Amino acid sequence: MRFSIISASLVLIFANVKAFNEEEILEIFCGVPKKLVSRYNQCLIDHGPEIIKKNYEIINSCMKGHLGSETESAMEYVCNKKNVDISIKRCISDKISEEMKEFDRRARLEVWDVLYVCIFKA
């Protein structure tokens, strides 16, 4: 569950920046130590805005049936290239893109504030 929140926040960051392709995003994400991911996830759960929670629900719905209940199993699924299912990627991408259309500038700034706190001060 927590994995989904970090995924959603990373999608938000990289969707806004558009500086990285999918492969580079995956490489960055999969290089993060699991302990740090857990700490970051908890910070987002505690401080995250509504859009993070919506994206978390989207990712959960798209990956339903492919994951166990632990963060590690989710990371292993996503980071193992053998498990990449294009339909899951497409589901997440399409639904989050749709959600972002209604995401105003003020809400984007709120996400950046929370991400900054969770990355640098947690």
UniProtKB/Swiss-Prot annotation:
Location(s) in or outside the cell: Secreted
GO-annotated cellular components: extracellular region
Protein's UniProt name: Venom protein 7.1
Biological source species: Lychas mucronatus
UniProt keyword terms in alphabetical order: Disulfide bond, Secreted, Signal
Residues in the signal sequence: 1-19
Organ and tissue specificity: Expressed by the venom gland.
Source superkingdom: Eukaryota
PTM comment: Contains 3 disulfide bonds.
Main location: secreted
